[in-house]
């Protein structure tokens, strides 16, 4: 498949984003969903038009004048366009545009079968929830957990926070979920009704969302199943996965559903993790995400949590446009002894990790949570289980400080996540140019709920975010079969302009490249401060030789806090012994961050923390720059 930007970088609600389009050699699939724009009139007019032509209708909350029409008399998926219905709408003088939605695959992630702290819970599975409090259960490593006990003891349990589970529905009648279910914030986009109950199957395949919901919001001390990470939070069901094919309208509607009621959206799904797919959000979904981080939660921004992917060493989550988005917090997983799970994908866009299973046959090494029809399970797994745990931790932080923005949450994640006893046999732990420790698979470490709520209490909103095109290489360059193509870009990060970026958050390398075998490409980028990010690692199952990457935005978080000014280096080469050919057609450097120091005004309570180290670095840099300005002033006067 192909993803890329079909237009220039667009300004949308104050953000730059890339409009991706995707092409496939397979025949397209057409659904019974239509995107309709009217010449004028509001929802009443849209309902009238829809009714006259046999459609149901929903207004799209993130786009003025656009409507979601659906026709229950049409097949949900077929190979031919419904030209009759499309033309019927287009002939109506009130209709400006009607576009039948194509379907595409989205897969659930990780659906597999497989007491030192004085926290007393009577829930029968609580002692098996090692990811909450790890005392060595199932041969785990004591102390390797989310440190929720400290957050709970400080009084934070997620009260006043709502998490939306975007999935195959949730069993909202489950006795461990019913008291925390937020019906007002829930919706079924698969059936277009307000009841997101899972569709029954003999194999209980649609238990995925219910399991995720229990990890976040299962009630405490009710003698049922286990305990949610944020057990006093509310959970909303957004049923959107259970149809033959996904559409842009359904994704966009789900991501933008009730953004003033839902604080955190948890997604344990994405493009197929087969090691050869390159895919991401379409135009409406990108628009909805941009709208969410700008306008959600009263302007503080919706918080999107994404499972990084289950393709293992055969895949790279930078080929997933959801997990690698700047607007999402991408979460990987570790097992209960700190090792990587066999299905873990690695990439430079992953921000942090939580826990799941993935190596051990012991059933108690899985994630204990709620299951369909009032049941419980010990067998939830994959990064599907990791993302809801993170959503629960973020709910605890929001209870500590409801004023946190979507970017504040990312900064808190970077600063409070810990290496703990995580172990990656492939990628070493390294420090970036400002001393922040990271790993290519685990990101900045495992979430620490206690540390996060304590820092969140005192947190001051980070400075305004700016975006700078740091430079671009547009001349085609051949990639040698052996050795590497090495290119450099020297940038001032827009210094002296309104959009100057001094302290980095996210960096994107927008790349167009073709190769005789896409899966053998390896791409690294090194910052001016010497931090190397692996933008793309080998994907042995990817045999593409025609499509390549078309303006694909590879993203890294590994240069967080660094100074973007200076020379950036891009290296492209092939892994493997077979002769190869390739051409790099474009490399554009996109810098995102702040002009002023983000941590200089923060309260430091732990002088051994990453915050203390980062603040010290900022103060020294501010002093150096002040001295330099004074010297220049003196020299100019003389």
Curated annotation (Swiss-Prot):
Any idea which residues are catalytic in this one? 167 (charge relay system), 208 (charge relay system), 384 (charge relay system)
Q: Which residues form the propeptide?
A: 26-109
Q: What is its EC number?
A: 3.4.21.94
What does UniProt give as the signal peptide span? 1-25
Q: Name one GO biological process term.
A: protein autoprocessing
The family database entries (PANTHER family) matched by this protein are listed as: NEUROENDOCRINE CONVERTASE 2, PROPROTEIN CONVERTASE SUBTILISIN/KEXIN-RELATED
Question: What's the protein here called?
Answer: Neuroendocrine convertase 2
Which gene carries the instructions for this protein? PCSK2
